[in-house]
Amino acid sequence: MDYATHYDVGDRKRDGGINEDSVAVSVFEQGHRAGFRGYDRDGAAGANEAESNDAEDPDDGADEGDAPEAEPPVDGESDRGESEADEAPPDGDPANRSAAVFALADGAGGHDAGDAASYIATTAVCEHLAGTVVTAARGDPAGFDLAVDEPLATPPRDADLESAVAEAVVAAHREVLEYAADAGEQAHATVVAGVVVGGRCHFGWVGDSRAYVVNAAREEILPLTTDHAVVQRLREAGEVDDVAALVHPRSNEITRAVGGSGRADPETATVDVETATVPLYREDVLLVTSDGLVDAQTEASKLYEWYVDAGRDEEMAAVVRDRAVTDDEIRDEVLSAASLSDAAGRLVDLANDRGGKDNLSTLLLHDGTLPPTPEDPPARAAGTRTAVEERETRVQ
């Protein structure tokens, strides 16, 4: 598994602001015997997962080709050498099996300690989930052509891992509240966090930071999250269309966050964490980002007024799309990049080119050992997929 991160204060805040975003990722890698043979080798690991999950879907993505040699990290950029492992290894070459925990948080700048909130959130989430991801990977030895029963635990199901993510975010929420109470400050942050293991991503979120899948085989971008935000509520109510949402003047208002003023009891306080699970494929790049990527336009309010005054006509809609950052542009930047680190940097540059209104951060992950994208993949975008508790049991 390869990953890259990039984070930036944003052009508008460069001379006087601070970066209140925080990104954390922890990758567990294991090599054994002749190397990891993948999740689709004779159906081995997939069948193991189906059996242990009451026969839930054992879902099986174009290689980027020869990526250029990785450059040293600079200015808030990290790059874990995707030049070698970004492709699925040829038959016979040893490969490591990978799993990961990730968390991205965006501190609320309108409050006293957003930077502390985001730091606490990302570190707390990863601390709580580190053991979970190793346990999940350890319980599935079939990818190494190995059959072990006792003493290995049965691999956790999708619902178990989603619950673990939610519990980690709630734990982070309580830690931020404890900090706020001790410091006498308000501390809020949005969070996107998850576990990538067994060819699946189990994730949860609070607020308007986002997760996407960009798939090279189908040349598409799939939003995995829906914003917990005022503008999203207006969209769902039919009061705001997709173009207006790009530049809406209330784009900075969220309806859910971790942390608070410290008045809530840190021992019992909770937050509603939305969770989901999706399969990942060889051609996928998992992208996690703060809202600074998509809410970058410093003249958003003016563009919104022009669009509304023009009767929301298509000509003005095209102007808005051209000046805002759209999902299609994000897809194109990722697919045309030479490497994950190149993509991460290009996304930050894109947001700054459009105004750089806020702090922005990106995390991209790719696993070349995964199965290729099937011809008819399951629905993965937010609003189209089936909740884990509603999936029908399948016999493979």
Predicted features and spans:
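PP2C/PPM-type serine/threonine phosphatase catalytic domain
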Residues: 1-396
